[in-house]
């Protein structure tokens, strides 16, 4: 375990060392900016969920980003939000990002507590994290940040590849056992506005009695002007490190601009598990809404949601939400 941790630490140090080799006595002036994001909502259920209502502070990000003109960037972000480890009304603060990124020509190297690449493209295309997480994040296929290193290279204007090596336990847990997660992705942009991506990863088990987790996903998205449409397919084997606990699902989402400050959007998710091992969580989810941009920093988004469980004895649930996003 110590050897693996030393390897990650050594790789994480590569970025500043390489960047230092490119500097000179007349280094350009650096620039910094604050990172602030607050996601909140008010919601109510209908029918059997009528008592589920109220205001929620879903998440807040506080951080700072410092960029040098030689391609070196430092970033630290704290995440304050809900956690399964505490009561629903309590919040826990985590360090989500603490990394160094170095960019040189077509190469990008990041080390530290970095953003993962498993569903970063999908999350960017969806563009409404404050309303609902992207599919893999929502259904726990992986974490959005982790401790490790990543490298991306643009071979051509329309083709790039990336690799990542992280602990595999996410940013909310400290690595205490052996096991790393390896991932690689390919991104194609053959036409203006069209993005195609394939990604696969393997997360080693920390114990011989457990199974390693394999993830792979395919994504296609098209965006031009005020219109975007995307679809993704996701598959995971040995979920929670348990043999044959496989699950998969797809997500389709679209946004249409109807003015400078208004967007209409919709999304449909489908989640299923092998041999119904996770039937209680299997089902279909749908959300439709309108996003109103109030100036540069604030978004208000009324939306309706439905969850249709796969289990025969489970009832559908309906909700109305008003989500708010404040970002700088």
Tell where the protein language model's regions lie, with residue ranges:
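Cleavable N-terminal export/targeting peptides
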Residues: 1-27
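Outer membrane beta-barrel
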Residues: 23-45, 49-168, 178-180, 187-194, ...
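Transmembrane beta-strands of outer-membrane beta-barrel pores
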Residues: 40-46, 59-61, 78-84, 104, ...
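Transmembrane beta-barrel architecture of outer-membrane proteins
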Residues: 58, 80, 94-96, 145, ...
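Detector for outer-membrane/organellar transmembrane beta-barrel domains
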Residues: 177, 187-275
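Outer-membrane beta-barrel "beta-signal"
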Residues: 186-188, 292, 316-328
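Outer membrane beta-barrel transmembrane domains
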Residues: 251-301, 305
């Amino acid at each position: 375990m110590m050897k693996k941790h030393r390897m990650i630490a050594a790789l994480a140090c590569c970025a500043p060392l390489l960047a230092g080799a490119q500097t000179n006595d007349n280094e350009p002036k650096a620039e910094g900016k604050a990172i602030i994001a607050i996601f909140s909502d008010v919601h109510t259920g209908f029918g059997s969920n009528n008592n589920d209502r109220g205001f929620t502070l879903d998440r807040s990000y506080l951080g700072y980003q410092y960029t040098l003109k030689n391609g070196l960037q430092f970033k630290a972000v704290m995440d304050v939000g809900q956690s399964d480890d505490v009561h629903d009304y309590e919040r826990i603060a985590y360090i989500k990002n603490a990394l160094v990124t170095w960019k040189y020509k077509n190469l990008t190297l990041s080390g530290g507590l970095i953003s993962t690449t498993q569903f970063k493209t999908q999350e960017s295309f969806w563009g409404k994290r404050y309303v609902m997480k992207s599919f893999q994040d929502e259904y726990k296929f992986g974490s959005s940040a982790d401790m490790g290193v990543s490298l991306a290279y643009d071979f051509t204007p329309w083709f790039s590849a990336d690799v990542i090596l992280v602990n595999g336990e996410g940013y909310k847990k400290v690595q205490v056992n052996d096991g790393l997660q390896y991932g690689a992705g390919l991104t194609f942009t053959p036409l203006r506005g069209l993005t195609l991506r394939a990604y696969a990863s393997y997360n080693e088990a920390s114990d011989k009695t457990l199974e390693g987790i394999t993830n792979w996903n395919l994504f296609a998205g098209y965006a031009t002007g005020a219109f975007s449409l995307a679809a993704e397919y996701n598959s995971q084997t040995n979920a929670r490190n348990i043999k044959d606990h496989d699950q998969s699902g797809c997500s389709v989402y679209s946004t249409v601009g109807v003015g400078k400050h208004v967007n209409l959007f919709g999304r449909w998710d489908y989640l299923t598990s092998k041999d119904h091992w996770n039937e209680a969580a299997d089902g279909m989810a749908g959300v439709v809404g309108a996003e109103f941009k109030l100036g540069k920093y604030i978004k208000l988004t009324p939306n309706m949601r439905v969850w249709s469980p796969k289990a025969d004895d489970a009832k559908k649930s309906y909700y109305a939400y008003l989500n708010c996003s404040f970002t700088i």
